[in-house]
Amino acid sequence: MRNINLLKIYSFLFLIIFPQLSISQNIKEIKKSIIASVENQKNDMIKTSDLIWEAAETSLQEFKSSAYLIDYARKNGFVVKTGVADIETAFTASYGSGRPIIGILGEFDANAGISQKRQPTREARVPGGAGHGCGHNLFGTASLAAAVAIKEQI
């Protein structure tokens, strides 16, 4: 499952970055660089995703989850603005200036009432608690990993 998700990230990044790069660059080198970036982030991505899974915070209450992602963004050289749109847990992570301007959305909120242990059979981690049935623990983490990989290419 994680390898399939990494392949999707690689493909997405290749399509986003390639048009922004000089035609003279070798496509194979670009692809290798993107794959290397995501692979280098793999352990951090899994750890962050797992932390967000365990926190399982519902919309507008994702204080721990937001902090995990903000910390990762800052460690990777992004300037972070918090409290975006007067939402305490919303943030933007920016890098560089000028063009291109690339925006990537990430969500990391959980849904109420769908707590789930990390296993293939139904068993609540916290009975009646929140959980990540929609995979937002992965979505937020993968979006930030994509932003880091793009940053490394531009």
Language-model features: where?
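Bacterial Sec-dependent N-terminal signal peptides
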Residues: M1-N26
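Acidic/His- and Gly-rich active-site-bordering loop/insert found
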Residues: Q25-H132, T141-L144, V148-I154
